[in-house]
Amino acid sequence: MNDHPAQDAFQHAELDWDENGLPQSRHYGDVYFSRASGLAETEHVFLAQNDLPRRFAAMQPDECLVIGETGFGTGLNFLCAWQLFERSASARARLHFVSVEKHPLTFADMQRALALWPELQAQAEQLLEQYVALNPGYQRLVFAGGRVVLTLLIGDVLECLPSLDARIDAWFLDGFAPAKNPQMWQPALFSEMARLSAPGATLGTFTSAGFVRRGLIEAGFDMQRVPGYGHKREILRGHLQSSTAQMADKPWFARPGRTVRERRAVVIGAGLAGCATAAALAARGWRVSVLERHADAAQEGSGNPQGVLYLKLSAHGTALSKLVVGGFSYTRRLLGHLQQGQDWQACGVLQLIYDDKERQRQAELAEAFPPSLVHPLERDAAEALAGVALTEGGLFYPDAGWAHPPALCRWLLQRPGIELLRHREALDLRRHGEAWQVLGGEGVLAEAPVVVLAGAADAARFEQSAWLPLKRIRGQISALPATARSGQLRTVLCAKGYVAPPRDGTHTLGASFNFQQTDDAPSVAEHQANLEMLEQISTDLYQRLQADPQRTEALQGRVAFRCTSPDYLPLIGPLADPQRFAEAYAALARNARQSVQAVCPWLDGLYVNTAHGSRGMISAPLSGELLAAWLDDEPLPLPREVAEACHPNRFLLRKLIRGT
């Protein structure tokens, strides 16, 4: 039995369109917005009752206002808030919009609905560009160069909000009417809203139902009835009057707090993790220096010509699986900024069955995830899709494909505020006043209040981070010249390795896992192993490529080293002093369930983003958003439990409790 909802639990909205072209939910039998004027209703119920015209105009540079919403629907409320923000707020202010939607509209329905509001065309076009690869869970969409962020939680609101880590400044309590959707309008919802609210948070809602008003008051909001809009005689507005201050139950995972005054950072390492970190910080107004020991970015693990968007999923709702789904969707949206065909290809990925254990695993995955993300194909259908003969079918990921990692790195580094410093090898770190100095062979390379270690396994080369349990695993790819017949391959094929359709006339094949060898020269043995793997994937493709295991000396290839952690999850977040950590939480060594409220001894301004292993194309881009959220105290782009599972302090905690 899997712990994910069955695939039928995820369902797009089913709409009926009336004679005026307005949408109505078939499931709930309710409208998405006022038939009189949805735009004016939004302005009155949500923008005005939350005092957003004044609040946006009063925002300071680098300030971020967070809006929470309980029903995304057509996106009308989001687009109206975004438009008002653009018109009213200072250029360096930011808007973060968190919304929940159980039944998202299909792209076609969203496009049709937004066409009703030509006044919002500028914002609507950007939303539609990013409205792809939306899957259950946390979805991060970025607009206006990072000035506007949408965190869309796809699922039931009563299941999504408890996992959210955010501080909401203004609430849009929206959704279908309480009489139409009573499952949502529960005391548990009002309690979660209070928990997530920043001090003095405001609230607007279209309903004036007495039980809603009483429930919000009981949760800590001061509520009042005010004149409604259109046929609504009254609506509700309110603000958080009282909330119970909660001590962090896991202080070792608590946010370090915003102690940095000057928004400058140094990122060590210009691979995908480092470039994504730099881009996320620059989008928030930080000035970032990226130190790279090579002549350019993406020269090591992120330097392969083709990286596959391969989703290694679990049917059991693991932290890694949630990270993979959220990360995949985010990467897929980023790739839309690159040149299709040259820098990436949305050709899909076909994961082939190769033994009975894999057959069972795939059956569980097909049941656990919606077909829009992954669906099974019998052999005949798989062959027709792939364009080559196969011995088995498998699982097809239609939104996946391959990408050229260096192109994504270069695009990420183009953001204003980022400086790439080449031929700068960081050898040491030292604290200097309120800043960190990064030292090289010739002295100080850079200095800033924040340093992010993003250099794969070399993140552990410094005294402050030497305890990080990182491991290097050699991987070799083989480059096979395409033939007229091999070029008919139309999708990425995966089994125990992968082969991609050609890029620049070459197929990428790989990659080996070599735990012993530590040099970076391609080996004949690993070329031969890659060719054997290709033959297992498709004998037909093997023959079309005229692959010859006796002529591997002539093959081109590339070696890089994956960086992994003991639990195969990345390390993303702030670093603590290991000795002081052990002292602060020593009681946990005697009783792991004991409540300890000591403040975590952070190494102020020192962060890490590494150990993405063979999933870098999936997890590294989103990791930049997660690290920036830790730094800027913004809503996390992943469920809290997933962020904790990626937190570096998990290893200090395990060592304390288990002694290992």
UniProtKB/Swiss-Prot annotation:
Native source organism of the sequence: Stutzerimonas stutzeri (strain A1501)
Molecular function (Gene Ontology), one example: oxidoreductase activity, acting on the CH-NH group of donors
Listed cofactors: FAD
Protein name, per record: tRNA 5-methylaminomethyl-2-thiouridine biosynthesis bifunctional protein MnmC
NCBIfam families associated with the record: MnmC_Cterm (TIGR03197), PRK01747.1-2 (NF002481), tRNA_MNMC2 (NF033855)
Gene that produces this protein: mnmC
Keyword Transcription (UniProt): no
Ranges where the record places region FAD-dependent cmnm(5)s(2)U34 oxidoreductase: 268-660
Pfam families registered for this protein in UniProt: DAO, Methyltransf_30
Role of this protein: Catalyzes the last two steps in the biosynthesis of 5-methylaminomethyl-2-thiouridine (mnm(5)s(2)U) at the wobble position (U34) in tRNA. Catalyzes the FAD-dependent demodification of cmnm(5)s(2)U34 to nm(5)s(2)U34, followed by the transfer of a methyl group from S-adenosyl-L-methionine to nm(5)s(2)U34, to form mnm(5)s(2)U34.
Location of this chain's protein in the cell: Cytoplasm
Keywords: Cytoplasm, FAD, Flavoprotein, Methyltransferase, Multifunctional enzyme, Oxidoreductase, S-adenosyl-L-methionine, Transferase, tRNA processing
Keyword Methyltransferase tagged: yes
GO cellular component terms, semicolon-separated: cytoplasm
GO terms, biological process: methylation; tRNA wobble uridine modification
Family: In the N-terminal section; belongs to the methyltransferase superfamily. tRNA (mnm(5)s(2)U34)-methyltransferase family. In the C-terminal section; belongs to the DAO family.
Superkingdom, natural source: Bacteria
Region spans: tRNA (mnm(5)s(2)U34)-methyltransferase: 1-241
Enzyme Commission identifier(s): 2.1.1.61, 1.5.-.-
Catalytic activity: 5-aminomethyl-2-thiouridine(34) in tRNA + S-adenosyl-L-methionine = 5-methylaminomethyl-2-thiouridine(34) in tRNA + S-adenosyl-L-homocysteine + H(+)
